Amino acid sequence: MRSRVPRKEIKSLAFALYDTGETILGALVVSTFFPLFITKHIDVKIYSLSYGISLLASFALAIFLGKLADENALRKKFFTLFSLLTSLFLSSIALLYGTPYLALLSFLLMLISHQQAMVFYNSLLLNFENKGFASGLGVSFGYVGSAIALIFLADKLKEPEVYAVVGLIFLILAVPSIITLENPEISAKISLKEIFGDRTFLLFLLSLLTLTEVANTLIAMMGVYLREVYSLESVEIYRIIGFSALGGVLGGIFWGVLTDKLNVNRVFPLGFFLWSFFFILLFFAKKDYLIFVGLLAGFSLAHLWSTSRVYILENFPKESVSVRMSFLSLTERVASSFGLFLWSFFLFITQDNFRLSALLMGTLPLIGFFIYLKTKLD
């Protein structure tokens, strides 16, 4: 008798493949090709302002659509719609390449669609029995997707076809989720006033912000830190970042399995101490131990991305999952800006002492832990 793969494993794989496509899109288009292209034709300030406005518009739309989806059980339909629109707007950039302002408009519409898709994508975890494993596997596949994008695709793809190719890759990797993932049928009347007034939820988001701030700062500044503190060459920096990706792959699986076995309420708080330990280690680390530091960086990032969305699913009303996931998305966006602002401030007050500035960043997770404790007391 032919053995069959259990359905929950198929669903987990489909979920992870979507994460792969999402990270390929982010690594190749959002972070690399499009910014380099558009800033040759449009003032950087206009691009930055447009990008920021699109994120605010995306959050406002996510709140509205999230409420609509939660009240009418439309999460899967919105996930499918915005996944298809993401691919469409991304591919359209190739056709509009000769008219930069129209290309920018298509890019911004792609960003907004992508953010909506991610909100409803995270909401679909609601139906998983093995939420931790599915989330962690998605994180692991995301790291693999980034590696594939930067190592194998970045040098081979050229503009403008890169946008059509990545749009197609994203669509192909989204299809398994569109076909196999089920719509959570939970629905209820949603009060935005109650959610905005949910003290426990807002305190959790604030505690989470302390982690996402240090995580996004690490992603943005790790290469610069290694160059300034250890005088590493580019090849050595790439090697350490590569080991960080390996730590992310291993960490996604590890934290996902641990979350299912121990419960996310036990696993998530470990992140506050994990990140503080990382920055203490970074302060004292000698050059010979940087590979281990890189592994720990990826391992810590994997913990954050694997557990945060599961924590929301398990600790707050499931009827309002889409609205709450839109707040998770906003937290990640805010952290990208505020974390870098704080890093710059620490460099300023320490007179460009990178080691000490990193150590100061390590105090944020400890502050976050005390905020998190307030959620339990409440």
UniProtKB/Swiss-Prot annotation:
Its main location: membrane. SUPFAM superfamilies: MFS general substrate transporter. The chain crosses the membrane at residues 12-34, 44-66, 92-112, 132-154, 161-180, 200-222, 235-257, 267-285, 290-312, 327-349, 356-373. It is a multi-pass membrane protein. It is found in: Cell membrane. GO terms for molecular function: transmembrane transporter activity. Keywords: Cell membrane, Membrane, Transmembrane, Transmembrane helix. InterPro entries: ATG22/LtaA_families, MFS, MFS_dom, MFS_trans_sf. The keyword Thylakoid does not apply. GO terms for cellular component: plasma membrane. PANTHER family: AUTOPHAGY-RELATED PROTEIN 22. This is Uncharacterized protein aq_1569.
